[in-house]
C-alpha cells in the first residue's frame, strides 16, 4: 500500500489530500497539521475581523471531522520536526503530549505555507500588537476589536492585507493609520500610477504615513502598546497590526537539504518535485511556474496554492502532470475601489529587459448616457516583438475585476493586443 504524508493542512495540503484520496482509494494518506485548524480560507480573515460576518466557521472549507470521514488520516496538533529523506521517515511531535514518534512515507508533500515578517522594532512583542496571518490571529483580533477602549489602530505596511485590514477596521468605526516605509502602496504588485490612484482614493479615509519608518513602540503599565515612534513623530495608539509581508516557512525543508530560492522558497519543478527524490512541495512555502516569464517564481496566493495542490496529488498517486502556470492574478477592494492585476507590470518588464510597450486608458464602465457610470483605469503591457499581452492592471469602482479576468484569459491563451481588441464580448449600455 502506498503511503503519502502531507505536512500542513490548509490550502495546498488539504487540496492535495482530498484529490489524492479521490484518485487512489487504497493509498494511506496522512496529514500532519501543527495547529487545530484545517482547510480555512485566509482571504476572509480581514472581513471576519471587520464584522462583515460573525461566524468564523464559514471560512472553513472542510472540517477536520469531514476530512477524517473521507478516509484521510488527519493529525491536528502534530508537528513534523525532522525529515529523514534517506530512510523516507519523518519525526513528529504530538504538541498535546510532547511525545515524539516516527512515520514512514513513499511520497512526501511539504505545504508549510508562509509566515509573517516581523520587523526589528523595539518592544515589538508587547501586548495589543499582532499579525493577521493565521486563523487564531483572526479569532483573537476579532475579540480585541470588541473592546471600546481600542479606538486608534496603526497598521505597519501597505500591501493587500494592510489595505484590507484598514477597510475592515474602519467598518468597525476605528481610527486607522497606515505607516509605510516607501512612497507607495501595494509594493511591486501594481505600477506606480495605480498606487498613486489608490492613495488619492483612500487618503481621506485613513491617516496615511508614507516614507515613514517605525523605530519603536512604547507600553503602558499593563504592557500594552500605548504609542508608536517613527522617524517623523510619535503617535498614540491602542493597537498595532503588523502587515509588512510574508516569507516562506521553509526551515524544515532547509534542514533536509532541499534547495531554496534566494528568498527561502522551496524550489520545485513544474511537477512539484524538489531536488530530493519523492519529496514535493506546493503553496506559499514553494515556488510556482510563472507562465509569462517561463520560470519558477514566488507568488504566494491561495488560488495558485489550491491549483498546485490538486495537480501534485496526481503526481503523488502515480501521474506525471505538469503545472500550466500562474499569472499572479490578484485583486483587492480598497474601500470602494476595485483593483486587479494579472501577468507582469511595466516595472517588471523593464527590470527584466523585456522589449515591451504599454497602453493606458481612462474610460467609463458603461455608456455615458446611462446613469451612475464610473471611471475605469486600464493599463496593458505587451511585447514589442510579437504584440502578445504580457500583463494588465485595472482600477475602478465597478467591473474592474471581471475585466481583468478577460485579460488573464487572453494572456493565458497567448493573444495579441490586436486579437484582444477583436474578442466578441457581450455589450449593453448599462
Residue positions per predicted region:
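Glycine-rich dinucleotide-binding loop and its adjacent helix/turn
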Residues: 110-172, 208, 262, 268-270
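A Rossmann-like FAD-binding core segment of flavoenzymes
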Residues: 26-28, 69-96, 103, 171-270
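Catalytic nucleophile loop
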Residues: 10-13, 159-162, 313
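Short hydrophobic core segments
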Residues: 7, 103-113, 235-245, 309, ...
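Flexible, glycine-rich terminal cap/loop adjacent to redox cofactors
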Residues: 7-11, 15, 21-26, 34-35, ...
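Rossmann-like dinucleotide-binding cores of NAD(P)H-dependent redox enzymes
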Residues: 59-60, 152-154, 160-216, 299-305, ...
Amino acid at each position: 500500500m502506498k503511503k503519502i504524508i502531507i505536512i500542513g493542512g490548509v490550502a495546498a495540503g488539504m487540496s492535495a489530500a482530498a484529490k489524492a484520496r479521490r484518485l487512489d482509494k487504497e493509498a494511506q494518506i496522512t496529514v500532519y497539521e501543527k495547529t487545530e485548524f484545517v482547510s480555512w480560507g485566509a482571504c476572509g480573515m480581514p472581513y471576519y475581523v471587520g464584522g462583515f460576518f460573525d461566524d468564523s466557521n464559514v471560512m472553513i472549507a472542510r472540517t477536520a471531522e469531514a476530512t477524517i470521514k473521507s478516509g484521510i488520516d488527519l493529525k491536528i496538533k502534530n508537528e513534523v520536526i525532522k525529515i529523514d529523506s534517506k530512510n523516507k521517515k519523518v519525526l513528529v511531535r504530538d504538541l498535546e503530549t510532547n511525545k515524539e514518534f516516527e512515520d514512514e512515507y513513499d511520497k512526501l508533500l511539504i505545504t508549510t505555507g508562509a509566515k509573517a515578517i516581523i520587523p526589528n522594532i523595539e518592544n515589538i512583542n508587547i501586548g495589543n500588537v499582532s499579525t493577521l496571518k493565521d486563523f487564531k490571529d483572526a479569532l483573537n483580533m476579532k475579540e480585541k476589536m470588541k473592546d471600546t477602549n481600542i479606538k486608534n489602530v496603526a497598521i505597519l505596511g501597505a500591501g493587500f492585507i494592510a489595505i484590507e485590514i484598514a477597510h475592515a477596521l474602519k467598518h468597525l468605526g476605528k481610527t486607522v493609520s497606515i505607516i509605510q516605509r516607501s512612497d507607495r502602496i501595494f509594493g511591486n504588485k501594481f505600477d506606480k500610477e495605480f498606487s498613486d490612484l489608490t492613495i488619492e482614493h483612500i487618503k481621506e479615509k485613513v491617516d496615511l504615513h508614507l516614507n515613514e519608518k517605525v523605530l519603536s513602540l512604547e507600553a503602558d503599565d499593563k504592557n500594552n502598546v500605548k504609542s508608536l515612534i517613527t522617524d517623523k513623530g510619535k503617535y498614540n495608539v491602542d493597537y498595532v497590526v503588523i502587515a509588512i509581508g510574508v516569507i516562506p516557512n521553509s526551515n524544515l525543508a532547509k534542514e533536509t537539504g532541499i534547495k531554496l530560492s534566494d528568498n527561502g522558497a522551496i524550489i520545485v519543478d513544474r511537477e512539484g518535485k524538489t531536488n530530493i527524490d519523492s519529496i514535493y512541495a506546493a503553496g506559499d512555502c514553494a515556488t510556482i511556474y510563472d507562465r509569462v516569464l517561463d520560470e519558477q517564481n514566488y507568488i504566494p496566493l491561495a488560488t495558485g496554492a489550491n491549483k498546485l495542490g490538486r495537480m501534485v496529488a496526481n503526481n503523488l498517486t502515480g501521474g506525471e502532470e505538469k503545472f500550466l502556470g500562474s499569472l499572479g492574478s490578484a485583486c483587492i477592494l480598497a474601500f470602494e475601489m476595485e483593483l486587479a492585476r494579472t501577468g507582469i507590470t511595466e516595472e517588471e518588464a523593464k527590470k527584466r529587459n523585456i522589449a515591451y510597450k504599454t497602453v493606458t486608458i481612462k474610460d467609463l464602465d458603461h455608456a455615458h448616457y446611462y446613469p451612475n457610470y464610473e471611471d475605469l483605469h486600464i493599463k496593458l503591457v505587451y511585447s514589442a516583438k510579437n504584440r502578445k499581452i504580457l500583463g494588465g492592471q485595472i482600477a475602478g469602482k465597478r467591473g474592474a475585476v471581471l475585466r481583468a479576468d478577460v485579460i488573464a484569459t487572453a494572456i493565458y491563451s497567448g493573444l495579441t493586443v490586436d486579437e484582444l481588441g477583436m474578442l466578441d464580448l457581450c455589450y449593453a449600455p448599462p
